Amino acid sequence: MAKNVVNVVKLQIPAGKATPAPPVGPALGQAGINIMGFTKEFNARTADQAGMIIPVVISVYEDRSFDFVTKTPPAAVLLKKAAGVEKGSGEPNMKKVATVTKDQVKEIAETKMQDLNAADVEAAMRMIEGTARSMGFVVED
């Protein structure tokens, strides 16, 4: 018999740094998840991606067991890392803060491909370029 999912929790947590402290602990506690069990398993699974923010989707079942799926880091995080900046522009149409190349955009699009609803890499690249422009980045050939 299949277990029924009673709750789905979505979080963005730094890789390898999940702790029972807020915001992770309260979100998991409300869902009835074993907080220490989740943090140990998440940290072990994401230890190789240190420094990245990892989105995670946690499915909670009737018997309070859970499983989770880690996604690829958000496009904005990957773009900031590629451009070497801390944050995007507050006024992206006025102030440009960084430049990324088409090759960097293609690399990010290939990384994100499994999580994007794009038919091919070119469509994924257009999505990533749009994110870059909205952050105040210039996309160069």
UniProtKB/Swiss-Prot annotation:
Keywords: Methylation, Ribonucleoprotein, Ribosomal protein, RNA-binding, rRNA-binding. GO terms for molecular function: large ribosomal subunit rRNA binding; structural constituent of ribosome. One or more lysine residues are methylated. GO terms for cellular component: cytosolic large ribosomal subunit. Disulfide bonds: none annotated. It comes from the Bacteria. SUPFAM superfamilies: Ribosomal L11/L12e N-terminal domain, Ribosomal protein L11, C-terminal domain. One of its GO terms (biological process) is translation. The keyword Magnesium does not apply. SMART domains: RL11. The keyword Cell membrane does not apply. InterPro entries: Ribosomal_uL11, Ribosomal_uL11_bac-typ, Ribosomal_uL11_C, Ribosomal_uL11_C_sf, Ribosomal_uL11_CS, Ribosomal_uL11_N, Ribosomal_uL11_N_sf. Pfam families: Ribosomal_L11 (PF00298), Ribosomal_L11_N (PF03946). Forms part of the ribosomal stalk which helps the ribosome interact with GTP-bound translation factors. Belongs to the universal ribosomal protein uL11 family. Part of the ribosomal stalk of the 50S ribosomal subunit. Interacts with L10 and the large rRNA to form the base of the stalk. L10 forms an elongated spine to which L12 dimers bind in a sequential fashion forming a multimeric L10(L12)X complex. This is Large ribosomal subunit protein uL11. It comes from Ligilactobacillus salivarius (strain UCC118) (Lactobacillus salivarius). The lineage of its organism: Bacteria, Bacillati, Bacillota, Bacilli, Lactobacillales. The gene is rplK.
